[in-house]
Amino acid sequence: MANPKLQTPNSIFAAMTRHQLVTQIREKQSYLIVGLDTDITKIPKHLLTEPDPVFAFNKAIIDATKDLCVGYKINTAFYEAAGVKGWVAMEKTVHYIGDEHFKIADAKRGDIGNTSDQYAKAFFETMPFDAITVAPYMGEDSVKPFLQHKGKWAIVLGLTSNTGANDFELLHTGGEFFYEKVLETVSLWGTEENLMFVIGATKSGEMSSIRK
């Protein structure tokens, strides 16, 4: 495991390649990604006396699951809500995970080009994430900055599992669902080496057609 010591914004981090990720999946016979969406109000009370309760909880989860999973997903909202302490806990966590597991920043970013560029730098350069979830609804210039970092991945929202997916993603227009248009269009912006999609696990009916 990597030392959880914080590193400087100019640090160069090794990225997990597609080949390495596939190798992990085959060796462990697992697609498991463990979520570290850590809510400090729900962690065991005995950890609240730790100097950094969130990191202490995450460390215990990582130690218990590292041999079973191929990666970890950190929902950044739970860390951002805690201010500086939350960011420190997130950075310590992602460094502790190390380079042998795929690290996803579940941040759902997406803004005008120069803003997305700063988001990409924050998660790919300042912190050593391998991938970040991205909202594509502002168009290509909001997604491209995440695709321009070699060895990094944009995981673009396609069809989500929340009830609100009915408001836009499942609208039927022009002979297809809106999410289908999103998948078709975004697929032209990247390759299988830097682009993935979020498809909600509750959408099993649509999953088979999407995978085709």
Where are these regions (language model features)?
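Short, basic, low-complexity termini and linkers enriched in Ser/Thr/Gly/Pro
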Residues: 1-15
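Conserved N-terminal beta1-alpha1 strand-loop-helix module at the mouth
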Residues: 15-100, 194
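Conserved anion-binding
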Residues: 45, 111-203
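A general structural detector for well-ordered alpha-helical segments in enzyme core domains, enriched
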Residues: 57, 61, 89-93, 119, ...
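Conserved PLP phosphate-binding loop immediately N-terminal to the Schiff-base lysine helix
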Residues: 77-83, 107-116
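Short beta-strand/loop segments at the ligand-binding rim of alpha/beta enzyme cores
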Residues: 99-108, 192-196
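A C-terminal functional module that forms or caps the active site or interfaces directly
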Residues: 201-212
